[in-house]
């Protein structure tokens, strides 16, 4: 059963934000007893609240067993709505309640871009408080989409270009997400400052073929459409997959490897050893953000977007 339509008519529902918080906590803990302890309520009270919510919504959110609980498919859909409602409630309280004791919260999932990290640093510094809970996830493309769709992240940062745009745009639409372009970039190569091609102003694909092509692993969705690099591994004879930016740059230095990206690189963050060179390739990257459709962004998200625009203004 889907949650859209008559089965999710909640006009006369007594559903509360507290119930939604219970639902999300149980899903995170995967155990009713542990969730009850975390929420400081009794296990029977928590079980009753979850059952009441399931009955109201007409869904079975969890499958119970001696080992704990697991989320059903319709439960995942309900959780996505719950996380978004809780996030919007937090944003509303943050905007209208003059409560300085409220903990600042913000989460963003992104591809491996230095400007995304720099913008995150700006937000933390701007809203520095005695306590806060900020999350930055440099992760795989598919997980970025999942994180934003399921309410784990308020924003996602990724890119589109001619070969992945149709596939990813369909995914955005399916998950009720919208893409907003931040800037356009021409393709560049990241290489070591001591690379044999380091003195070239422009580098061709043919010149790169003797060297290892370094790409970010995409897990189960390891198709060209989810790649962070717009140059297919099929075009290069030597390929190495990595999970993090530090490893990629170490291999670029140690093996004279290369990767392709936007050309935006930060020497303070990545050091002086990695340089950017223009790639002789007719292609344009559209780097932007994804967010849930029709949501109000938190002040932290708005500041983050403004900061990204500042860090990429020279592109």
Model region roles, listed by residue range:
Residues 2-10:
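Short, small-residue-biased leader/transition segments that mark boundaries at the very start
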Residues 24-42:
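Short helix-boundary/capping micro-motifs
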Residues 54-71:
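A short LG(V/I)-centered, amphipathic sequence patch enriched
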Residues 103-167:
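Central regulatory/effector-binding core of bacterial HTH transcription factors
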Residues 115-122, 165, 198-201, 205, ...:
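Secondary-structure junction motif
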Residues 149-153, 218-275:
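Hydrophobic hinge/microswitch elements
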Residues 171-187, 191-213:
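Flexible hinge/capping segments at coil-to-helix
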Residues 174-180, 185-186, 246-296:
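Beta-alpha-beta core module
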